[in-house]
Every structure is written in structure tokens, then in C-alpha cells.
Amino acid sequence: MVKHIVCFKLKDRKKSEEAKEILLSMRGKVPTAQEIEVGVDFLDSARSYDVFLSVTVRDGKALTEYQNDPYHVGVVKKFMHEET
């Protein structure tokens, strides 16, 4: 099992919930992702990250497949690159 964890600082913190929904939208659409968890900063601290993503995959090969998955690249990465 491999855990892939990413923390994001958004350009506009008000988009945290939208980012959360986009990240969670991978459930059922990215087959190699066994588990997806998303958290949003509730402290509203400038030092905190705004959103975090934790994805569990089977192994290193599955992680590569996840990172190259068309939905992950086309929808999720595109949105996150525009907002971070």
C-alpha cells in the first residue's frame, strides 16, 4: 500500500470547498485510487495549507497509473494548477 499526500495553498482560500469537491470527484472515476481523503483548513491561519489530499493506491505501479489517469490529469490537475 502507498499513501500519496499533497498539500495545497490556493490563490483564493474561498475556493477551498470547490477544490475539495473536485478532488473528491475522483472517487469511482480513477480506478487505481483505493481511498481518497480530502481535508480543508478550519483554523483559517495564513500558515496553514488550504486543502490536503491523501490517496491510497496498491503499489508504486498503481501510483504511476493514478498520476497519469486521464480524469486525474484532465480535470483535477488542471483545476488545481489554475488555483494554486
For each of these PLM feature ranges, what is it?
Residues M1-D50, R58-N68:
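Short S/T/G/P-rich N-terminal loop/turn motif that feeds into the first structured element of a domain
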